[in-house]
Amino acid sequence: MSLWGPSKTVMVSADKALPGRASEIRVPERHYVLDTLLKPPFPVGMEVACFGMGCFWGAERLFWKTGGVYSTSVGYTGGFTLNPTYEEVCSAQTGHTEAVLVAFDPAEVSYTALLRLFWEGHNPTQGMRQGNDIGTQYRSAIYWTTPEQQAAAEASAKAYGEALRRAGFGAITTEIAPAGRFYWAEGYHQQYLAKEPGGYCGLGGTGVRYG
């Protein structure tokens, strides 16, 4: 049973979401691990991807350790509240999910390779939760930034969904939608597991391989 009750797993409507604020949350200029820019504009040739895999601490580390990734950062997206705080997102009254923004060089790592990390790195069949982390902020999501990413994401969901079905899992619940505004999370969340190596990591896949 969720400590917060069943409402934590029900998406808030736009008219009932918290209003937020006009001012953005300030974050460091550079990546704690990679020493690259944390926010755009990124160097010419970089592409941007956005994934929600539950708690963003472990998800971000998965991507910053991948060759060809220029930068990663964590934040909130997919909802309604302007410039939300972590506490507001945890209340399930913003509509946002915890997400990782990945800037990558497609000449070095493909979007398909990032999709593999995404699918194998979490359980995309759990709806508004990921393991013991329960709530709308932990939903599985792919927010695409180009038509090519959309096509690849949708095709990969179909293929991986069939692999999961054969392995006895339920249907994929991953939200696949165009990327909206990304609100960077507080500075202490950025590259959290590099600063706190023994910190919580909720990542856990199904054991089913992609492709």
Swiss-Prot record:
The active site is at residue 55. Disulfide bonds: none annotated. It catalyses: L-methionyl-[protein] + [thioredoxin]-disulfide + H2O = L-methionyl-(S)-S-oxide-[protein] + [thioredoxin]-dithiol; [thioredoxin]-disulfide + L-methionine + H2O = L-methionine (S)-S-oxide + [thioredoxin]-dithiol. The keyword Calcium does not apply. GO terms for cellular component: cytoplasm. HAMAP family: MsrA. SUPFAM superfamilies: Peptide methionine sulfoxide reductase. The keyword Oxidoreductase applies. One of its GO terms (biological process) is protein modification process. It comes from the Bacteria. Transmembrane segments: none annotated. Has an important function as a repair enzyme for proteins that have been inactivated by oxidation. Catalyzes the reversible oxidation-reduction of methionine sulfoxide in proteins to methionine. Keywords: Oxidoreductase. One of its GO terms (molecular function) is peptide-methionine (S)-S-oxide reductase activity. Its EC number is 1.8.4.11. Belongs to the MsrA Met sulfoxide reductase family. This is Peptide methionine sulfoxide reductase MsrA.
